[in-house]
Amino acid sequence: MNFQEFKHKYGYDAATKMMQQYLDIKFAHLDCLLLFRMGDFYEMFYEDAVLASGVLGIALTKRGKNGDEEVPMCGVPYHALENYLTKLIEENYKVAICDQLETPEEAKNRGGYKAVVNRNVTRIITPGTVIEENLITTVEPNYLASLVVPKNKDTAALCYADLSTSTIFVVNVPELEILNELARLKPREILLSEHLRSSDLASNISKQLNFRITYQVDSFFAVNKCEKIILDFYKMKDIKGVGEISNSQICAIGSILEYLTLTQKENIPNLPKPKIIDFHSYMTIDFSTRRNLEIVTNSCGGNKGSLLSTLNHTVTKQGGRLLYNFLSSPLTDTHKINQRLNITEFFHSNLDITAKVRELLKKTSDIERCLTRITMNRGSGRDLLSIKYTLETANSIKEIFFDNYGFELPSFIEKIVKPLIRNDELYNLIEESICEDAPNNLNDGGVIKHSYHPKVLQLHDLINNGKLHIEKLKDQYKKETGIDSLKISHNNVIGLFIDITAKNANKINDPKFIHRQTTVNSVRYTTAELQKLESDLVNAKTLVVSLEKELYEDICKRVTKQSDYLRILASSLSGIDVFCNFAYIASENDYTRPEFTDDLSFDIVKGRHPVVEEALNKERKSFVHNDCHLSEAERIWLITGPNMAGKSTFLRQNAIIAIIAQIGSFVPAKSARIGMVDKIFSRIGAADDLIKGQSTFMAEMLETSAILAQSTKNSLIILDEVGRGTSTYDGVSIAWSVLEYIHDKLKCRCLFATHYHELTIMDNFLPAMQNYTIAIEESGKDILFLHNIIAGAADRSYGIHVAALAGLPASVINRAEQILLKFEKNAAGKGKNILSTESNNLSLFAIESPKLQNSKLEEKFKTIDPDKLSPKEALELLYQLKSNFIKQ
């Protein structure tokens, strides 16, 4: 609606001046909940009030009328704002904070008693732009992302920034990998062009990934505009100052900087230039695999039971965030992986140093986020103190290394220790200026040390010794006048005054004594000196707070100039924390250093699942370790055996071992030789996707299709029960053909678990496939799951035994056994296997299927060479094929 329609709807012309001010500001922020500061409360009106009262659980009241209808209103105390903002941000609302820009007294002085206090929006808070500790998690990054998908290109540009830590990155992402990349980053908010609103991509982002999308008009991403924004923001003359970036990346970076500028108003973040990321530098793990393996969250989205919760024994907040990033993005460069492993091994070999360093790290603060708050004028004296204490502790950590090693530190350790050297200029600045007990709120005063500035000392002297100054002035006037009975008194009418008895009035001859009042018994005077003292006493508290704010802002500017140093220091501390953490868990849990090879080795001896092992240890139970020996000659393990025997755990543990190894950690195994894994795919279990109208089987097939399309020779595929969501013959056929495709086309490493025992004969003609099963012990009708993976194939699933363990009624179990016996007798009469092993052709079954004639479409496909088609020719051909298909 336009402004005239808006004014009419809300009765603008009949509203009070204050309400007109509210409506003016609200119209400029229609996409936000507007929190309007009125005294000690932030108020909301109309639809905002109705919505917020429900979300926040606060009372809905009324204020005035709009025509015949009362205006809904609700409010929250200003001092409790962050608590309420937390709820609004969790619900993905966009909130505009409208503050008073002057005091009521200043408004009266400006425009009389009817003047409305000046107000304006000082900040817009969105899920991707929060920096307050209460509004963000300590471990996960809080990314705002901008995704630019150019037309007729197969690569998108993605820029993502964490405002709370002042970090920003940009990466080119293959179009097929966009959802996987977003799943890696888990941005709280994604900027997307309006023309993509109805696209499948936008639908998948919001429904499948459940991420918030903020749409912007197409011009928001215009390349020329975005380039100018970047140049202005970083004060550069040439875009090459950022690095070699594409037009799409320019649009992604520029749009994020513009959005941050719009939402943060005057408090522009001090972001470094974007770090350009190579998409292929880290392992690809798709959305469903991250969910199945429970890498950073469990299957319900929580932390308990995730791989992160098991591995995270970091002692700093920034260390926890770095570990989260490591687990989200395992490396694919074996040289860099080994560099990390060297650091882990150093700390593992020097556990005495590790223990001392970890104790000191506990005393450091999250200076990344402290620095951001300071640079954006939302910091406090305590943030500065946190930086000072961290500088001091970092220096102590550095001394531990040099005390033990002197100058013989390994170069890779010296590199991360060197930034710990204390910046004395910065340390001394904070030490000399900020009170040790500085409050969070600058308005409370007491932030700046009295000794830091003479005026601060003078004002505090006035505040603390006001009566003493009055006494000194009284004694001075007694000497000057010779009147011993002279007093200095105070009342609410004339303030401070010199009080002299009437009989002594003739002794006042000095013109500096100004007559104020005569009473029956006394004459009252003042002096310029006394007036100044009174003014200073009255205003001292206000003046000292104002002066402290000025000095604090100057100190913050000087600290901000050291941003690069502080970021490097924070990075060093977080890295040391993570590698000490790796050493700690390795020593506590008997992990070993993995060895990386240039082939397809995946040779794990006595491997364990770290999360399951941790859970069993709490129950004082032991985890049964297993080997896994994949190689060029034996790329595929087909694993059969009963449910509950440990197949799924075995599949997951090997994928997890690959991830742990490639983040630079030791692994839960006796030994591990691994050929670098570029992608991990896991299809384990499935659930109906009712929102998208997909059955279990359709969801399973979509995941399997994506795996087969995106895997490379260096990938690791984990498949569990492919084909189980349909009829037996269909399921066996699909599982068979998938195995063949992986073996013959992809030629990558694969662990394939199945209940289709018919597949075990495939080792006769798939030379790189071997059968493995789960060892069990049978005693009559009872079975014992040994959880050991052994060579061989299972011929039974023992499903009825599992059903009995689950507590099904005995009558149901007995009946199931009778039915199973009949099926087994019938199968024996017809021949044990329905599958033919005599032929290696595409036909799975002994019964020959009727031959189908090729359709015209199939004949047409045979003539097409997709590598020689231009994008335009491919599109035209697609329309032609669609038309022919409809005719057929």
UniProtKB/Swiss-Prot annotation:
<dbReference type="InterPro" id="IPR045076">
    <property type="entry name" value="MutS"/>
</dbReference>
<keyword id="KW-0067">ATP-binding</keyword>
<dbReference type="InterPro" id="IPR027417">
    <property type="entry name" value="P-loop_NTPase"/>
</dbReference>
<keyword id="KW-0234">DNA repair</keyword>
<dbReference type="InterPro" id="IPR007695">
    <property type="entry name" value="DNA_mismatch_repair_MutS-lik_N"/>
</dbReference>
<protein>
    <recommendedName>
        <fullName>DNA mismatch repair protein MutS</fullName>
    </recommendedName>
</protein>
<dbReference type="GO" id="GO:0005524">
    <property type="term" value="F:ATP binding"/>
</dbReference>
<dbReference type="Pfam" id="PF01624">
    <property type="entry name" value="MutS_I"/>
</dbReference>
<comment type="similarity">
    <text>Belongs to the DNA mismatch repair MutS family.</text>
</comment>
<dbReference type="InterPro" id="IPR007696">
    <property type="entry name" value="DNA_mismatch_repair_MutS_core"/>
</dbReference>
<dbReference type="InterPro" id="IPR005748">
    <property type="entry name" value="DNA_mismatch_repair_MutS"/>
</dbReference>
<dbReference type="Pfam" id="PF00488">
    <property type="entry name" value="MutS_V"/>
</dbReference>
<keyword id="KW-0238">DNA-binding</keyword>
<dbReference type="GO" id="GO:0030983">
    <property type="term" value="F:mismatched DNA binding"/>
</dbReference>
<dbReference type="GO" id="GO:0140664">
    <property type="term" value="F:ATP-dependent DNA damage sensor activity"/>
</dbReference>
<dbReference type="InterPro" id="IPR007861">
    <property type="entry name" value="DNA_mismatch_repair_MutS_clamp"/>
</dbReference>
<dbReference type="InterPro" id="IPR036187">
    <property type="entry name" value="DNA_mismatch_repair_MutS_sf"/>
</dbReference>
<dbReference type="InterPro" id="IPR016151">
    <property type="entry name" value="DNA_mismatch_repair_MutS_N"/>
</dbReference>
<dbReference type="GO" id="GO:0006298">
    <property type="term" value="P:mismatch repair"/>
</dbReference>
<dbReference type="Pfam" id="PF05190">
    <property type="entry name" value="MutS_IV"/>
</dbReference>
<dbReference type="InterPro" id="IPR036678">
    <property type="entry name" value="MutS_con_dom_sf"/>
</dbReference>
<dbReference type="Pfam" id="PF05192">
    <property type="entry name" value="MutS_III"/>
</dbReference>
<keyword id="KW-0547">Nucleotide-binding</keyword>
<feature type="binding site">
    <location>
        <begin position="641"/>
        <end position="648"/>
    </location>
    <ligand>
        <name>ATP</name>
    </ligand>
</feature>
<dbReference type="Pfam" id="PF05188">
    <property type="entry name" value="MutS_II"/>
</dbReference>
<dbReference type="InterPro" id="IPR017261">
    <property type="entry name" value="DNA_mismatch_repair_MutS/MSH"/>
</dbReference>
<keyword id="KW-0227">DNA damage</keyword>
<dbReference type="InterPro" id="IPR007860">
    <property type="entry name" value="DNA_mmatch_repair_MutS_con_dom"/>
</dbReference>
<dbReference type="InterPro" id="IPR000432">
    <property type="entry name" value="DNA_mismatch_repair_MutS_C"/>
</dbReference>
<comment type="function">
    <text>This protein is involved in the repair of mismatches in DNA. It is possible that it carries out the mismatch recognition step. This protein has a weak ATPase activity.</text>
</comment>
<dbReference type="GO" id="GO:0003684">
    <property type="term" value="F:damaged DNA binding"/>
</dbReference>
